[in-house]
Each structure stands twice: as structure tokens, then as C-alpha cells.
């Protein structure tokens, strides 16, 4: 049995634990969240859990002007799904704990996974967990700005396509950002949702299940009870 910590060190450990917890707690951004009932420009976004990975789906017609030009094959898609992750782990045809560990400690770069959908998310992914979230126009634009910034660009400012994606009409693109044990694909989704102004805590979103829990609890708004737009 180890020796007990001196009292002052025990207080220090407890204080650090409290500080870490408080650092993870966030508040709503009042200029973006919550959306107002009846406000012009409210949008619906969808959060999708595929098991290990989560993604964000937006209506293409509402988003395309704020995103980099993507492949022409996506021009007819009604919706776009975005996910982010380690290039080795995300692009692998099968998930494994070995690949996950390698990504966590020695990532070789990151990618964005973009999927073109013709049907609404719940229909396109009948076996996935899907949460629909209403966001304000300011929150929607801030979220899309973060997604756009995640694309690594070529000298002409275009997105850098890497090849076909994992399912459907999808493609991988070279991405910005560093993947590590404390910042995973699910952390990225939570941080991107945070741009809508909702009080989701990215530091807690290490798993797909936590992303969905927080999205459902903190980001979903009952507009029937929301304050009306002025």
C-alpha cells in the first residue's frame, strides 16, 4: 500500500481536479444560442452517430456558399455530411483498437470525410442515431466557417481531394488540425457544434455516445417554448 499524500499535496490534487472540471464547463454564447422562435434564418443541422464516429449533416443549398468548392458530383446532393479524423484510422476499411492507438500517439495527419446525401439523414442512415438540432443563422454561419477552415487548401485555394470515402457518394479531403488522444474525431464534432453557441463541452466528447448525449441535452431547443424573435 502506498503512503498517503501530505495534506497540502492532497489539497493541490483536489484543486487541480476541480480546475480541470471547471475548464471543461461552458456557457451558451448569447449572440448565437438559443435560436429564437420564428426568427428568420433559423437552420436545422443533424448530428449522426455511426458507432465509433460522429458526423454533422447540413442542407447543401443552405451551406454551399460558405464552404470551399467540392467535387461536381456533389452538386445535386440535398445534404452534406462532414466528419474529421486521423488519416490512418479514418481511411482504414475496418476499425480496430490498434489503429485507434496509433492515431492517438502518432498521427500522420488528418482528413475530412464528406458524404453527399440525396435523402434526409434519418432516411439515409436508418441504422444510425440521428439528432436534429435547430440553430440560429449566426450560429449556423459560425459553424460552417469552422468546417470551411478545416479544409487544407492548395495554392489556388481549393480543397485537396484524396480519394473515395467510406460509404455512398463520399470523398476524403486533406484537413487542418492535429489528432491526438485528447482531441479525436468526436471532439472535433463537439467543438464544431459549439460554434452554434450551444453549451456543449468538447473536452468531454471523447466518444460518439457522449457527443449524442450532449447534443440531445444541451443543443436541442424546444422552439414552442423558446423566446420569440423581436
Give the ranges of each region predicted by the language model.
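Amphipathic, soluble alpha/beta structural segments
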Residues: 12, 48, 228-230
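C-terminal motif of bacterial Sec signal peptides marking the signal peptidase cleavage site
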Residues: 21-24
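A short, compositionally biased
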Residues: 50-52
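Non-catalytic ligand/cofactor/substrate-binding and regulatory segments of enzyme domains
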Residues: 30-48, 59-174
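Activation targets extended, charge/polar-rich intrinsically disordered C-terminal tails
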Residues: 27, 149-230
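Bacterial N-terminal signal peptides that target proteins for export
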Residues: 2-16
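Short beta-strand scaffold segments in enzyme catalytic cores
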Residues: 55-57
Amino acid at each position: 500500500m502506498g503512503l498517503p499524500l501530505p495534506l497540502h499535496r492532497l489539497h493541490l490534487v483536489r484543486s487541480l481536479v476541480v480546475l480541470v472540471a471547471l475548464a471543461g464547463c461552458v456557457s451558451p454564447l448569447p449572440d448565437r444560442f438559443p435560436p429564437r422562435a420564428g426568427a428568420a434564418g433559423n437552420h436545422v443541422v443533424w448530428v449522426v452517430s455511426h458507432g465509433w464516429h460522429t458526423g454533422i449533416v447540413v442542407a447543401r443549398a443552405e451551406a454551399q456558399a460558405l464552404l470551399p468548392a467540392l467535387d461536381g458530383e456533389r452538386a445535386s446532393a440535398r445534404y452534406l455530411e462532414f466528419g474529421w479524423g486521423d488519416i490512418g484510422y479514418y481511411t482504414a476499411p475496418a476499425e480496430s483498437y490498434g489503429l485507434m492507438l496509433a492515431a492517438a500517439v502518432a498521427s500522420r495527419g488528418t482528413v475530412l470525410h464528406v458524404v453527399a446525401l440525396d435523402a434526409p439523414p434519418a432516411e439515409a442512415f436508418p441504422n444510425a442515431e440521428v439528432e436534429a438540432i435547430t440553430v440560429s443563422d449566426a450560429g449556423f454561419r459560425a459553424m460552417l466557417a469552422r468546417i470551411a477552415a478545416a479544409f487544407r487548401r492548395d495554392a489556388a485555394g481549393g480543397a485537396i481531394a484524396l480519394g473515395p470515402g467510406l460509404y455512398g457518394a463520399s470523398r476524403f479531403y486533406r484537413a487542418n488540425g492535429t489528432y491526438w488522444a485528447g482531441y479525436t474525431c468526436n471532439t472535433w464534432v463537439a467543438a464544431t457544434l459549439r460554434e452554434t453557441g450551444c453549451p456543449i463541452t468538447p473536452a468531454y466528447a471523447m466518444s460518439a455516445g457522449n457527443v449524442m448525449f450532449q447534443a440531445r441535452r444541451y443543443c436541442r431547443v424546444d422552439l414552442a417554448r423558446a423566446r420569440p424573435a423581436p
